[in-house]
């Protein structure tokens, strides 16, 4: 195959993580986002397509604006990679945008920022309508201490206390630019913007913040937890249900659209 004829495309997609066993293809053939997407892309391209993602997501984790790139020799109009691919995707995944990009564009390595939201339901009885869409605790949470604790995350730090044991990142040092907490009608929203995130980092942070909000961990204890740089004394990893990848930042020259977070979220 003549590689000079290849085109590189970037697509932005949204998916319901509760329907899939994470992003990455698996040998046993269980449904994953990558497997479903590559199958649909191949239908339009008329050839096998391999994808590279901005950031892999675990089972149950959602995305409103995941970014993927792929190479193909198939000359197709932009809408073929949107409406055409969507026609071949299973329920729970949709391509939002597609754009031909420079051959050197890389969905993972060119990303300089990532945005996550954790949606948490804090009510005595979990709503059946929000199951798989939001995390849940029956505990009443005090948002004030949670906000003060979240503010301690901002900056470049070693986040080993919020790192999964199986994390493959070369360094636990990451930079958090923004950590906002809001509360409305029994729903707590945690918005994090950072240069990159460790495996389970957001879910581990959420678990610790729930401890703070429920009085099981003080703000000072949260600060000490960060300094411990160890998972051994940290609260458990919180459920994946409420975690959403809501955006990826790229240099403007690539023209990658980052959609607004949906109003329902």
Curated annotation (Swiss-Prot):
Superkingdom, natural source: Bacteria
Binding site for substrate: 116
Keyword vocabulary terms for this entry: Isomerase, tRNA processing
BP GO terms, sorted: tRNA pseudouridine synthesis
Enzyme Commission number, as recorded: 5.4.99.12
Catalytic residues in the record: 58 (nucleophile)
Segment forming the signal sequence: none
One of the Pfam families matching this protein, by short name: PseudoU_synth_1
HAMAP family for the chain: TruA
Protein name: tRNA pseudouridine synthase A
Source species: Neisseria meningitidis serogroup C / serotype 2a (strain ATCC 700532 / DSM 15464 / FAM18)
Biological classification of the source: Bacteria, Pseudomonadati, Pseudomonadota, Betaproteobacteria, Neisseriales
């Amino acid at each position: 195959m003549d590689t000079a004829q290849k085109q590189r495309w970037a697509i932005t997609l949204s998916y319901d993580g509760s329907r899939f066993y994470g992003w990455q293809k698996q040998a046993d053939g269980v449904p994953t986002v990558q497997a479903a997407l590559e199958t649909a892309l191949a239908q339009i391209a008329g050839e096998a397509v391999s994808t590279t993602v901005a950031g892999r997501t675990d089972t149950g984790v959602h995305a409103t604006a995941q970014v993927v790139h792929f190479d193909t020799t198939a000359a197709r109009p932009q809408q073929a990679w949107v409406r055409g691919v969507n026609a071949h995707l299973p329920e729970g995944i949709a391509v939002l945008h597609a754009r031909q990009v420079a051959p050197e564009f890389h969905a993972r390595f060119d990303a300089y920022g990532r945005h996550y939201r954790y949606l948490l339901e804090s009510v005595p009885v979990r709503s059946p309508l929000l199951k798989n869409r939001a995390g849940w605790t029956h505990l009443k949470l005090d948002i004030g201490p949670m906000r003060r604790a979240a503010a301690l995350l901002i900056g470049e730090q070693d986040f080993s206390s919020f790192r999964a044991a199986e994390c493959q990142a070369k360094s636990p040092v990451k930079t958090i630019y923004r950590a906002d907490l809001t509360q409305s009608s029994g729903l707590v929203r945690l918005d994090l913007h950072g240069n990159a995130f460790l495996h389970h980092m957001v879910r581990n942070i959420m678990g610790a913040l729930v401890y703070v909000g429920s009085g099981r961990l003080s703000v000072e204890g949260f600060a000490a937890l960060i300094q411990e740089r160890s998972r051994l004394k940290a609260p458990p990893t919180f459920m994946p249900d409420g975690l959403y990848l809501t955006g990826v930042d790229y240099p403007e020259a690539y023209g990658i659209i980052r959609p607004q977070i949906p109003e329902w979220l």
